[in-house]
Amino acid sequence: MGELVLAAKITHVPSLMLSEQLEPLKGTRDGPINALKLIGQRARERGADTFVVFDTHWISNFGFHINANPWHSGSYTSPEAPHMINDIVYDFPGNSELADLIAAETAKDGPLALAHKVKTMPVEYGTIVPMHYMNKDKAMSVVPIASPVFASVDENRRFGAAVTRAIKRSRYKAAILASGSLSHQLFENSKLGPEAWNKISSEFNRQMDLRVLDLWREGRFAEFCAMLPDYTRKCNGEALMADTVMLFGALGWDKYGGKAEQLCEYFPSSGSGQVAVEFHLN
């Protein structure tokens, strides 16, 4: 029997990698970078062999899509931000067996779910950036999962629950990573400038993000799940916060009773709100 050994909400913003090289960002993202490294270390210490990544930069329309390739490799340039993320080489194993199980388990509940083995299918930067810090040694297999922007909150919740069931049916120990922002209202072009790297675009969004972190810290997960449908819409959720909805579906939704541990300070990035939080399973 398999096991879910770790679950976390993580950041993947381009400024993480840029902060290792360029002023004025140099060194400013050490907190979240160290948080990603810590999550990777904890996954290994708990015997994880696979990262399942809910990737808000792999956008899909209809159904649920899982990258089931046995190996992921390529050179990635972001079509939305080629000036920030370009020619990033990635190379790590996949897990076709677990991907197939996730698709099969999801289909039992009704929705279309497809596990793709297509050599030309790329991996998006919502997976590539965290793997840069968590999986440089290629020791862990990776299953990227798309964010379906036309799925309802309830459909994404049920999908997350199916992922956990599939993991438990498998022979693998997996860590789930919800890779995406909290609020996600980026700046208009006219408001861009050096200071935008470290500013939020909306005080309302910032206050809502901080309220969410308070609810998590206080263990008030039923209240959070009740507000999540509104939060996704009113705070400009990245891919409608599909990753967060799937994560809480995987955790048991409003029945989750574990502890949320914030691993870095909340930080703004180009208008969005970012954080790294582990949701403990014991």
Residue positions per predicted region:
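Non-transmembrane, aqueous-exposed alpha-helical and coiled segments at domain scale
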Residues: 161-169, 174
